């Protein structure tokens, strides 16, 4: 009988990262998925990254994950979003060739050390004494294991809706999983339903692009992965169009036929990626909504119209498409649809992503209530690492709000749960200036090296980068001009007779890297990414210093423990509402208590005073 230490169920974005991470740690791992050609399948939009999401991809790459490297083998349209704003909100994004992405993922995983792939369906999980023992396949056979990672995406009791038509499926032409839903219910997990959707696919040969707006990508694609030197995939353009008043009229006239508005779907959809029906209803005063026409591949004429996800009947979709500029003669290749599926309240998992009820069972991805490839992949890599570390009896790998967006996401989910699909935003991260795309490896790769999840090749690249950063920083401290000379060449500085280094100049408002290169031509020889990193560090030095002080306070509060048996109703001077919230959330640390919505600074002070009085030996204060 085959036996593996870790078994991953599901080959989507969470599953492939979980399986690869476990395998990198030297643990025999099995990935079970339904179809061989669908590893890392892009079920919805053909793109990776975006605002906040791009930072997640960089963090996954920093831990030697797959997503960043694979998109660099398949990216056909790179664009840095929000680049005119501050660096904390820059969002690297790349349009993907679907076929190239799946091909690259398949080639990597089928040749991955310590990883085997089984094409089949898991119907049940064998559990004894609240601990996983084996997976049970649909033919009745069992595969024993120590740890199981569930990354089931939208397949748990998945149900597709197109108008009044219902199709049991986890994705188009792929059957849903009911056995695992029943397993989770039997064990006693809190299960609810969520909904997501996708737009119709359009034949690009039937689009009149002269009526649309060209959206070029960046002139020089910036790779996601530290392992990629140059993106050599051909680059193409995207296009933008918009809905019209006629589009809106058709949607309003047919709202009763939409699965979302007919009452057919009761599950909650993503707030920040609404269907076109939702947009028309919720933003009724808007006369138009933008639609991004995104090619699905270099040799594929299919177009993904980002912005018009819908569950209207197919005939209504055909009608509304023809009211959009450039799409008057467009042909729909596949109708859009909504899909609802089961998920588990993420407060049922710990920050390692292991479930609290069942030892050795981990959840990652949409099963935890998230939406998005990047969010799923971020959870997958953490679940894979922790499952493997547990097999090896090593301490868990914990990411926090202070060092990563992945940590922010896991913290949000495990403390507060979610009643709608959770999507990552920069606004969720209070330390976002410190958690940028350009420094993801500086934040996380050393942590990955320490636990053994980072390859030798990436370790060498990282160490070389760190060396070059310090070398460049020292150079920027030595290159200097007198203030009088700087004034003569047009730099606005006070003529105090001192010398100004490049790092000093970087701190001047509106002073750019391009200006620095003109003054000091030697800077042209420096790696542009390293120069930009040091520019950002210098430009925002005072803000980063303040943020580091906040991070230090956060880390201090994270180790200030709150006893499990605390009675908040015995704490004087806090309101009944706050007592009820604290009793409901049961925070384990002062830091977590502070993050609960509605908990005031005064209440936190009252808790600390109460604990110091009750535990005057200070035993509650630290984990040590």
Curated annotation (Swiss-Prot):
Summary of subunit composition and partner proteins: Homodimer. Heterotetramer of two MnmE and two MnmG subunits.
Compartmental location: Cytoplasm
InterPro entries per record: FAD/NAD-bd_sf, GIDA_C_N, MnmG, MnmG-rel, MnmG-rel_CS, MnmG_C, MnmG_C_subdom, MnmG_C_subdom_sf
Keyword list, A-Z: Cytoplasm, FAD, Flavoprotein, NAD, tRNA processing
Required cofactor names: FAD
Protein name: tRNA uridine 5-carboxymethylaminomethyl modification enzyme MnmG
Species whose genome carries this gene: Rickettsia canadensis (strain McKiel)
Amino acids binding FAD: 10-15, 122, 177, 366
Main location: cytoplasm
Higher taxonomy: Bacteria, Pseudomonadati, Pseudomonadota, Alphaproteobacteria, Rickettsiales
MF terms (GO), sorted A to Z: flavin adenine dinucleotide binding
């Amino acid at each position: 009988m085959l036996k593996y230490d870790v078994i991953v169920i599901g080959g989507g974005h969470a599953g492939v990262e979980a399986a690869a991470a476990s395998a990198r740690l030297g643990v025999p791992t099995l990935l079970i998925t339904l179809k061989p050609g669908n590893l890392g399948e892009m079920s919805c939009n053909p793109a990776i990254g975006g605002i906040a999401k791009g930072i997640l991809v960089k963090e996954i790459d920093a831990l030697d994950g797959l997503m960043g490297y694979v998109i660099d083998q398949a990216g056909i349209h790179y664009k840095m979003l929000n680049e005119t704003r501050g660096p904390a909100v820059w969002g690297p994004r790349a349009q993907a060739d679907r076929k190239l992405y799946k091909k690259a993922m398949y080639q990597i995983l089928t040749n991955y050390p310590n990883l085997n792939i089984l094409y089949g369906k898991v119907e049940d999980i064998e559990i004894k004494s609240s601990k996983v023992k084996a997976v049970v396949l649909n033919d009745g056979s069992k595969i024993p294991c120590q740890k199981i990672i569930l990354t089931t995406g939208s397949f748990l009791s998945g149900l597709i809706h197109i108008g009044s038509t219902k199709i049991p499926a986890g994705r188009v032409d792929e059957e849903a999983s009911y056995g695992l839903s029943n397993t989770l219910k039997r064990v006693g997990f809190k299960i609810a339903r969520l909904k997501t959707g996708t737009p119709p696919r359009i034949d690009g040969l039937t689009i009149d692009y002269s009526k649309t707006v060209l959206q070029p990508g960046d002139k020089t694609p910036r790779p996601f992965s530290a392992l990629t030197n140059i993106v050599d995939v051909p680059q193409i353009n995207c296009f933008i169009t918009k809905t019209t008043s006629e589009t809106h009229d058709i949607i309003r006239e047919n709202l009763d036929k939409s699965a979302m508005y007919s009452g057919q779907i009761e599950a909650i959809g993503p707030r920040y990626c609404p269907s076109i029906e939702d947009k028309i209803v919720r933003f009724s005063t808007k006369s138009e909504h933008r639609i991004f026409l995104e090619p699905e591949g270099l040799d594929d004429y299919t177009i993904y119209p980002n912005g018009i996800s819908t569950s209207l009947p197919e005939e209504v979709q055909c009608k509304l498409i023809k009211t959009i500029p450039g799409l008057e003669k467009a042909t729909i290749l596949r109708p859009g649809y909504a899909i609802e599926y089961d998920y588990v309240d993420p407060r049922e998992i710990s920050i390692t992503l292991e479930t609290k009820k069942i030892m050795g069972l981990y959840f990652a991805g949409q099963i935890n209530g998230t939406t998005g490839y990047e969010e799923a992949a971020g959870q997958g890599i953490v679940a894979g690492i922790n499952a493997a570390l547990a097999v090896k009896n090593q301490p868990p790998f914990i990411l926090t709000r202070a060092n990563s967006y992945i940590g922010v996401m896991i913290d949000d989910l495990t403390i507060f749960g979610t009643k709608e699909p959770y999507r990552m935003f920069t606004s969720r991260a209070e330390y976002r200036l410190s958690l940028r795309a350009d420094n993801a490896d500086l934040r996380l790769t050393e942590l990955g090296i320490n636990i053994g999840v980072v390859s030798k090749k990436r370790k060498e690249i990282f160490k070389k980068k760190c060396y070059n950063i310090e070398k460049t920083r020292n150079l920027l401290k030595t290159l200097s001009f007198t203030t009088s000379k700087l004034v003569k060449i047009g730099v606005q500085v006070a003529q105090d007779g001192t010398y100004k280094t490049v790092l000093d100049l970087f701190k001047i408002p509106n002073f750019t890297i391009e200006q620095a290169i003109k003054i000091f031509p030697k800077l042209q020889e420096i790696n542009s990414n390293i120069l930009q990193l040091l520019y950002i560090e210098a430009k925002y030095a005072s803000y980063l210093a303040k943020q580091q002080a906040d991070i230090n306070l956060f880390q201090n509060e994270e180790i200030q423990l709150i006893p499990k048996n605390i009675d908040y109703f015995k704490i004087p001077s806090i309101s009944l509402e706050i007592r009820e919230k604290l009793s409901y959330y049961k925070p384990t640390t002062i830091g977590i208590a502070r993050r609960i919505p509605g908990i005031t600074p005064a209440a936190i002070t009252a808790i600390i005073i109460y604990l110091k009085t009750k535990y005057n030996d200070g035993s509650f204060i630290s984990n040590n």
